[in-house]
């Protein structure tokens, strides 16, 4: 049973790796513009519409995952993305067809990101439960880095369609998901095998009451996402145009290193929480904010490298940490709702960042560098507020008596 449970956890994490397949378009946007000259304002939807679909799919998952089998939702989502990507690769379609198929690639980013944390919380052994949710985020980040790398390699032909050969990587993953993804909605013994019976019973006893600390964490995530995404939306413009510290090649290297840093932080977030306890998210928010100050303060390439890597590392500590706390503080249908909202809020943060951050930055002179710097300062303020949400959450999850001793 232990071996089977381990295989189930591994396959769930493998499907997490596949969630952000939509990101292929971001690395070949220039080729897309070349393929549709004079239609740039419409062609950009190939890379932006999937994020909107991802956000909508995540919010819809709060309902879908309550009434549908979670394994089926994951399988169907992956199958849709494979078919959509294959159509872009193999069929000579007009622009509207490519936009529609690209949009469908955003579905797994919403549904898988919502379903997998709730499944992991059920099937993972108790001693791994506070780790696997961080691994889930880490695998999604690793998947994004892999898809962008392969998309760029396949796109060397000059045809953006060839980048979608990357989608073929999902076929063996889908086969493994069909065979070994834990069917927690059908086989209730999986929850008991993982020690989850107690949580299930607690969920029933609570009568569906949604914990207030979960509301607080979702709000923290929303406000945080608006401002931590300022780095990703401004760093290339700052490096290439505003500060003129390097070319797009330098920006690309920094982006890749950021992905590596984010992958590492997802793997170590459980140890971070155990070491810093109720201060875990406060410190991560503040250090993420401090890192975002480095490019503007140093006006150097080294400052951009250090700022980007540290920003992404602590950003993913926050993302994985809040995911972990939320997954451990909610059970049953509340957990499904919480994770769906969390995935949707991430997309909302990206969307709102594009409108709110420039307005705030303009109050202090404007520009990409100022947008990043002001956002960093705001993240530090959010970090202070985070303490008042995480302190009771940490006590709820780890126990009041052990808050200052457990895992010390």
Segments predicted by a language model, with ranges:
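Extracytoplasmic
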Residues: 7, 13-37, 231-236
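Helix-to-loop junctions at the C-terminal end of transmembrane segments
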Residues: 58-70, 265-277
